[in-house]
Amino acid sequence: MKILSILLIALVICSISICTEAFGLIDVKCSASRECWVACKKVTGSGQGKCQNNQCRCY
């Protein structure tokens, strides 16, 4: 039972770190969200993104 709980905690921690690395700010300057769509598509494979504080954020 102790090993199962340790494995579960390790799985949660790894999942959180993978999700936070996969999405986020990329080094592309922008003034409108449409400028981020192509850049996000190239970086993450998904065209979902928005301009936030003059920097693209991909989802």
Swiss-Prot record:
Other facts: Negative results: has no effect on rat Kv1.2/KCNA2 channel.
Q: What does this protein do?
A: May play a role in blocking voltage-gated potassium channels Kv1.2/KCNA2, and Kv1.3/KCNA3. Blocks the voltage-gated potassium channel Kv1.3/KCNA3, with an IC(50) of 118.3 +-55.8 nM.
Record key words, sorted: Disulfide bond, Ion channel impairing toxin, Potassium channel impairing toxin, Secreted, Signal, Toxin, Voltage-gated potassium channel impairing toxin
Pfam families xrefs = Toxin_2
Question: Which cysteines are cross-linked by disulfides?
Answer: C30-C51, C36-C56, C40-C58
GO annotation, cellular component aspect: extracellular region
Give the tissue specificity. Answer: Expressed by the venom gland.
What protein family is recorded?
Belongs to the short scorpion toxin superfamily. Potassium channel inhibitor family. Alpha-KTx 16 subfamily.
Can you name this protein?
A: Potassium channel toxin alpha-KTx 16.7
Q: Per its UniProt record, what Gene3D superfamilies does this chain match? A: Knottin, scorpion toxin-like (3.30.30.10)
Output the Gene Ontology terms for molecular function.
Answer: ion channel inhibitor activity; potassium channel regulator activity; toxin activity
Q: What organism does the record attribute this protein to?
A: Mesobuthus gibbosus
Its taxonomic placement starts with: Eukaryota, Metazoa, Ecdysozoa, Arthropoda, Chelicerata
